[in-house]
Every structure is written in C-alpha cells, then in structure tokens.
C-alpha cells in the first residue's frame, strides 16, 4: 500500500500545478447546533461530527460553484455531473499505517444524518481494509481533516483526478473578537489546495467564501 500511496502522491505533485488558499471560519453556531442535534439524536445512536457539517458544506458549495467539481482531462476541463466527496481515512500505524479515501456519492442530495452514517460505515471498512474499489472510486473532491489530532493548520496534496482538496484543522476554543468585543469562541483554519489548470485564485476565494457562509450559518446545512 505504501508504494501505491507514494506513486500517486509523487504523480500528483509533479504533474499538477498546486497552489493553496486558506481561510478562517467562525464555528460558534455550528458547535452549538451540533451539540443540540447530538443531544436530540443520542437515543437513536447518532452522533454528528464537525466533519459531517464540513462535507455537507463542501457539497453545497460545489453545487453553486461547479468549476471546483471538475478535473483536468488532457487538454480540456471535464465538469462532473455528480458531487462525490472523498473522505481521507488514516489507517492504524500498528497495522502498517497508510491512507485510504472513502467516497460518499451524491453528497449534495444527502442529509447530515445520511452523510454521518455513511462516513462512519465507510471509515470502519477502510480501517479493516474492507473497502471495495467502487467505494474508493469516482471522487470529485476530497476532504482531509486532522482536527481530531489537535492539528491547527496543514496543507494536503491533491488526490487525482480531483482538482481540489480541503485540509481542515481543529475547531479551537480560544479568545476571539466578535462584534468588536473580546470573547471566547470557536475558530477553524482550512486550506484549499487547487489545480491551477482548472481553478483560478479568485474562483477558489469565491468557493471558500460560500463554504464560510454555510458553516457560519449552519442551519442552512439542514435544508
């Protein structure tokens, strides 16, 4: 597996003109909504993660900005009709480590509950190396989240043939300024790595601003 990972990453870095754009997200409302929903859904065995909101937000952002949901195909840009988000899953170091990308299909048409359930099921299959080729194929965008490890900021290498990957840090509870007042709130830094053949800087900024609007007003993710 390590040889396959190495080959794909080297191919990505040497053939794709990478660049990165970062943005901070205020997650006070998202964390409060997540706590409320998890309290209401606890009896059903459902627990939404921050990443579930992020995946849903990414899908809705791509529906508005379809150029992020595209690939470079030789000499032209291929626009994808489906929004299939790959979720990077780290494998146990005790079992040799590695990384697999589990693919959630048609994410823009799925609820937070459905995304959460499917992500958990696919992640468990990934950790036991039980994913089928179909469950690892046809992603059009990838999310990599190291927030659960306390990482604040990082950049990720694009997962071909995708044109973008979002690297999410931790939602940190810290002193912040809200309405010109110093208070305690949640902030997350996310960095988007992009293929410059497909997505220009201003296009990336517009996509990130749409995502920011969704995550900072998380009720929009429930519609």
Model-derived regions: residue spans:
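C-terminal catalytic/motor cores of large multi-domain enzyme assemblies
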Residues: 1-223
């Amino acid at each position: 597996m390590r040889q396959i990972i190495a080959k794909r990453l080297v191919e990505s870095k040497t053939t794709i003109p990478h660049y990165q754009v970062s943005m901070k997200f205020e997650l006070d409302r998202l964390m409060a909504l997540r706590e409320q929903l998890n309290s209401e859904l606890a009896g059903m065995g459902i627990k939404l993660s921050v990443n579930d909101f992020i995946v849903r937000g990414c899908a809705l952002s791509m529906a508005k900005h379809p150029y992020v949901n595209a690939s470079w195909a030789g000499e032209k840009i291929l626009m994808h009709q489906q929004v299939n988000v790959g979720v990077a899953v780290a494998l146990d170091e005790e079992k040799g480590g590695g990384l697999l990308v589990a693919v959630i299909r048609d994410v823009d048409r799925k609820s937070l509950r459905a995304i959460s359930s499917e992500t958990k099921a696919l992640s468990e299959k990934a950790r036991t190396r039980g994913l089928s080729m179909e469950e690892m194929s046809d992603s059009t965008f990838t999310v990599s989240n190291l927030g659960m490890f306390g990482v604040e900021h990082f950049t990720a290498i694009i997962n071909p043939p995708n044109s973008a990957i979002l690297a999410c840090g931790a939602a940190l509870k810290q002193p912040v300024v809200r309405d010109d007042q110093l208070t305690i709130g949640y902030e997350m830094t996310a960095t988007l790595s992009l293929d410059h053949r497909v997505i220009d800087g201003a296009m990336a900024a517009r996509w990130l601003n749409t995502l920011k609007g969704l995550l900072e007003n998380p009720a929009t993710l429930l519609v």
